[in-house]
């Protein structure tokens, strides 16, 4: 009898790449002419990035710089969750950007429902912040991966432990 094949669906961010991208973005902000005499900065705190700038326009530029550095380091922008722009001390504005790690229960249920509705002969189960998909046929597993890549679930998905 053939052994069941499986893979895990996860949503993780490589933190070292985020750290590198934040440092590169901060360096670019310090060197750019349009940010001279500006209070613009980025700071990484645990699972969030704090953006500070003089006004909304410069804050938008800081976000653009950060996003370009993250993309260059292959960090998906779907892993970012932007908070509200808030006024801060000294006539500045600040914004928190959360790094979304793991698949929430709601997204896990949505993924399960998509897999079950597709009628592909596999089973899926939520295990903490990941979803495990098991099936007898590896082609069915490939089909599930293709199905999920086509869907826009609003989070970055990685497929790991393919066995």
Curated annotation (Swiss-Prot):
Coiled coil: none annotated. This is Nucleotide-binding protein DSY1969. Belongs to the YajQ family. Keywords: Nucleotide-binding. The keyword Translocase does not apply. The keyword Cytoplasm does not apply. One of its GO terms (cellular component) is cytosol. One of its GO terms (molecular function) is nucleotide binding. PANTHER family: UPF0234 PROTEIN YAJQ. Nucleotide-binding protein.
């Amino acid at each position: 009898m053939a052994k069941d094949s499986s893979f895990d669906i996860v949503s993780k961010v490589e933190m070292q790449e985020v750290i590198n991208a934040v440092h590169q973005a901060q360096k670019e902000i310090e060197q750019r002419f349009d940010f001279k005499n500006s209070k613009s900065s980025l700071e990484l705190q645990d699972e969030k990035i704090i953006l500070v700038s003089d006004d909304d326009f410069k804050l938008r530029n800081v976000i653009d710089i950060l996003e370009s550095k993250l993309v260059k380091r292959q960090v998906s922008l779907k892993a970012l969750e932007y908070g509200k722009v808030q006024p801060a001390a000294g006539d500045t504005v600040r914004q928190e950007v959360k790094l979304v790690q793991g698949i929430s229960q709601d997204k896990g249920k949505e993924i399960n429902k998509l897999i079950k509705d597709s009628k592909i002969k596999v089973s899926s189960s939520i295990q903490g912040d990941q979803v495990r998909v098991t099936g007898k046929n590896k082609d069915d597993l490939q089909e599930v991966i293709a199905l999920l890549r086509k869907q826009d679930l609003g989070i970055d998905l990685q497929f790991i432990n393919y066995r």
